[in-house]
Amino acid sequence: MLIIETLPLLRQHIRRLRQEGKRVALVPTMGNLHDGHMKLVDEAKARADVVIVSIFVNPMQFDRPDDLVRYPRTLQEDCEKLNKRKVDYVFAPAVEEIYPQGLEGQTYVDVPGLSTMLEGASRPGHFRGVSTIVSKLFNLIQPDIACFGEKDFQQLALIRKMVADMSYDIEIVGVPIIRAKDGLALSSRNAYLTAEQRKIAPGLYNVMNSIAEKLIAGNRELQEIIAIAEQELNEKGFRADDIQIRDADTLLELTETSKRAVILAAAWLGQARLIDNQSVTLAQ
């Protein structure tokens, strides 16, 4: 496994891979890797000849400076995990390598609508930062496929739209959420939880299951369903942030013709903002 930190060296290897006709898969990450990331790697390995994992804590997508500062950086441990998984390349550039002129005045990629709705409404600039760094990685690495986790449901939808709108010839693969045995979605931010909070954390998944059961039963009183769910979260020790029930295919409001719904949930537990989602097939 080769660790690449500079753009010239990356370009050199990408040119060689292209000349050899290799099928390349990209797994973009911010590091602090867990089993959910390893599932992305496994999916990439099954679909390509060469797997490149990027590790870059992207300052452009953080809406709070304190969150950027305390985001876990575990490059050595991450590389050890990826080496055991027989990843071919790790691209781990410094911020100055990606943004040599700094962030101010930086050209960016924005996806209208999807970047400012739902999660984007509460985190201004976040999705613009995501789409910009992913676009830069696509331009640099020129992958045939790229793997993203379905835990970040809106992010995946945004990347799919960007790829379609910008005519990237890249297959976007969504990989299902990996959960702990108690239902908690694996996330780098789970590291912020205390031992006591970790015991409470699966409550978010349980509340989503309760919402799903109501939707499957035909209940469409969405405001009431959401209000009850927020109350349940608060009673469990969370601070409910945002719960939405949307059309899973468009992320717009549910209509009578919607075939699938997605429950999008975000809640604070101590210093950790946990997000999760669950898709539900609706009775027609």
From Swiss-Prot:
Annotated (R)-pantoate binding lies at: 61, 155
InterPro entries under this entry? Cyt_trans-like (IPR004821), Pantoate_ligase (IPR003721), Pantoate_ligase_C (IPR042176), Rossmann-like_a/b/a_fold (IPR014729)
Q: Reaction catalysed by this chain?
A: (R)-pantoate + beta-alanine + ATP = (R)-pantothenate + AMP + diphosphate + H(+)
Is this entry keyworded ATP-binding? yes
Read off the Pfam families from this record.
Answer: Pantoate_ligase
Which domain of life does this protein belong to?
Answer: Bacteria
Q: Could you tell me where this protein is found in the cell?
A: Cytoplasm
User: Which GO molecular-function terms appear in the entry?
Assistant: ATP binding; pantoate-beta-alanine ligase activity
Residues reported in the UniProt entry to bind ATP: 30-37, 149-152, 178, 186-189
Write out the GO cellular component annotations. Answer: cytosol
Using the UniProt record, name the top-level EC class of this enzyme in a single word.
ligase
Question: What are the catalytic residues?
Answer: 37
Known EC number? 6.3.2.1
Going by the UniProt record, its keywords in alphabetical order are: ATP-binding, Cytoplasm, Ligase, Nucleotide-binding, Pantothenate biosynthesis
Residues annotated to bind beta-alanine: 61
Pathway annotation from the record: Cofactor biosynthesis; (R)-pantothenate biosynthesis; (R)-pantothenate from (R)-pantoate and beta-alanine: step 1/1
Task: Show the Gene3D superfamilies listed in the entry.
Answer: HUPs, Pantoate-beta-alanine ligase, C-terminal domain
User: CDD domains in the record, alphabetically?
Assistant: PanC (cd00560)
Protein purpose: Catalyzes the condensation of pantoate with beta-alanine in an ATP-dependent reaction via a pantoyl-adenylate intermediate.
- Miscellaneous comment text of the record: The reaction proceeds by a bi uni uni bi ping pong mechanism.
Q: What is this protein called?
A: Pantothenate synthetase
Question: Whose protein is this, by species?
Answer: Salmonella paratyphi A (strain AKU_12601)
